[in-house]
């Protein structure tokens, strides 16, 4: 049909529609009973199928109809509450023009299409192709599927395959969730909507900005396949591959996503976040960076979190970095985790005093590491089976076979407490079987101090003083001003104190029950130059931070 003919027909439809409202039907404007469908056999040769194989568009009911013929084509013009069917597809409208020759349809006003399912489409204007069941809906278009409502100004809908597309902007509303985009495709079979170009999702708690997003109106699952941001309060998630279930508040993210909050930042190859429970699991080169005054990072192959309890649980070669101005403290172990001191449910050895009321909430934190603990900083290194570090009392507790190295000093005992001030070692206490060894430059000789308990004090990261009490025993190599050996002193006392200068013993003080003597080195057997239990373990000492974990590589 040419444009002039179409205009004339549409104008005639308009006049007919007006007449139907104010006059009784005339001879050319026949009333039709709603209960009795009418098909003119002189206009439609085959009441079942057309030449192109498409099913016949059948008339069901209307208030009036007109028969038109133009350009060798036949038209039925229906006005008033029109109902038409093609197979199981029902079409409704105020006015419909049926081209019986081409099996096409144009509709005006209150258009409604349903294919005997839960998907309904509405519009002010419709052009429908019966051969392939394609509907072109325009003006105030709405599509509903029982869960979501999609609105746009222009929708091309494949009724047979239940696929609709828009390219001039659209909006989907599902409960309190609103999605908008410039383009989109609706898939009725799966209830998925693929949004493209300038996509935004809003609900009560979240905002998502992306360029491509697939959303399921039933499951409320949003899938990302392009750079996307999920904004929830102060938290921003950046990802390019993953999904977010709006209803369940669960995210599964891949391809090195990032979580950035006001107090922390997370990066990992894969993330599984459950906001309903406040939990998360971060897999593959996971990095947690705190933004509070504590200032620590946690690296691991796997990190589990509980935001409500402020818990981090790291496995797969975890590494903890406690940041300092000039000297970061690195801690590695088989397992590392952190939580609140105030939430501890069971006693930690010697740590009950840490569970009291803590005024500064940033200090209400502990770090625990167990099995194969290794520590490295420029000024101090250590190893133990387990570690407990409380920020509330600034104490690092090394438990089970602990050993500490500081410059040329090695210290061992049953349990070692390291007290930290401003993130630097301030004091060290050794409980039971304390043994300190100091290597003398490049020689084969060692100063030694042994006792029941031992205390050491630090200045600027170096040991300035040692004191042992209870069955104290000491071997000390005396040097002259030219660093030449004068002799060796082997003594016992109740208390022995050693002061250090330039990381070397400078003065020894004995208190109570002193016994011992000074002898030339050459007159003492080598076996007697070492206190019983002597064990120099320099080969176990971490030389650099690279010795702690493969994560550094």
Question: Which positions does each model-derived feature cover?
Answer:
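Bacterial Sec-dependent N-terminal signal peptides
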Residues: 1-29
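N-terminal amphipathic/hydrophobic interface segments
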Residues: 21-553
């Amino acid at each position: 049909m040419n444009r002039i003919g179409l205009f004339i027909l549409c104008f005639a439809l308009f006049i007919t529609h007006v007449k139907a409202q104010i006059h009784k039907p005339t001879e050319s404007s026949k009333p039709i009973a709603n209960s009795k469908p009418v098909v003119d056999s002189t206009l439609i040769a085959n009441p079942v199928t057309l030449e192109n194989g498409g099913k016949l568009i059948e008339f069901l009911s209307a208030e009036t109809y007109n028969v038109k013929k133009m350009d060798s084509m036949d038209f039925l013009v229906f006005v008033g509450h029109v109902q038409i069917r093609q197979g199981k597809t029902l079409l409704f409208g105020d006015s419909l023009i049926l081209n019986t020759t081409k099996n096409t349809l144009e509709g005006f006003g209150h258009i409604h299409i349903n294919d005997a399912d839960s998907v309904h489409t509405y519009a002010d204007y419709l052009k429908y192709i019966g051969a392939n069941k394609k509907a072109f809906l325009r003006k105030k278009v709405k599509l509903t599927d029982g869960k979501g409502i999609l609105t746009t100004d222009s929708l091309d809908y494949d009724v047979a395959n239940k696929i609709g597309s828009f390219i001039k902007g659209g909006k989907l509303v599902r409960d309190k969730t609103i999605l908008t985009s410039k383009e989109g495709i609706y898939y009725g079979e799966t209830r998925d909507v693929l949004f493209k170009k300038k996509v935004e999702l809003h609900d009560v708690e979240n905002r998502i900005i992306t360029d491509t997003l697939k959303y399921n109106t039933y499951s409320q699952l949003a899938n990302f396949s392009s750079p996307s941001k999920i904004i929830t309060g102060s938290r921003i998630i950046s990802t390019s591959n993953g999904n977010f279930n709006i209803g369940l508040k669960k995210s599964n993210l891949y391809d090195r996503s990032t979580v950035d909050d006001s107090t922390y930042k997370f990066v990992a190859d894969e993330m599984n976040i459950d906001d309903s429970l406040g939990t998360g699991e971060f897999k593959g080169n996971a990095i947690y960076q705190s933004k509070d005054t504590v200032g620590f990072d946690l690296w691991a192959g796997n990190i589990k979190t509980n935001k409500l309890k402020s818990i981090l649980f790291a496995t797969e070669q975890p590494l903890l970095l406690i940041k300092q101005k000039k000297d970061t403290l690195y801690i590695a172990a088989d397992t590392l985790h952190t939580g609140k001191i105030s939430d501890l449910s069971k006693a930690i050895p010697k740590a009950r005093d840490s569970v009291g009321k803590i005024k500064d909430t940033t200090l209400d934190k502990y770090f625990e590491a167990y099995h194969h603990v290794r520590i490295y900083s420029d000024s101090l290194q250590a190893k133990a089976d387990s570690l407990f570090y409380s920020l509330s009392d600034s104490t690092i507790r090394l438990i089970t076979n602990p050993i500490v190295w500081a410059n040329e000093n090695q210290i061992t005992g049953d349990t070692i407490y390291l007290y930290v001030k401003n993130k630097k070692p301030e004091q060290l206490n050794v409980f039971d079987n304390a043994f300190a060894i100091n290597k003398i430059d490049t020689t084969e000789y060692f100063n030694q101090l042994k006792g029941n308990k031992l205390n050491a004090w630090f200045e600027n990261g170096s040991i300035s003083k040692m004191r042992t009490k209870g069955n104290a025993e000491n071997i000390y190599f005396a040097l002259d001003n030219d660093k030449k050996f004068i002799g060796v002193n082997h003594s016992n006392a109740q208390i022995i104190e050693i002061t250090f200068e330039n990381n070397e013993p400078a003065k020894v003080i004995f208190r109570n029950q002193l016994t011992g003597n000074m002898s030339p080195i050459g007159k003492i057997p080598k076996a007697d130059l070492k206190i019983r239990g002597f064990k120099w373990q320099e080969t176990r000492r971490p030389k650099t931070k690279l010795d702690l974990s493969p994560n550094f590589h």
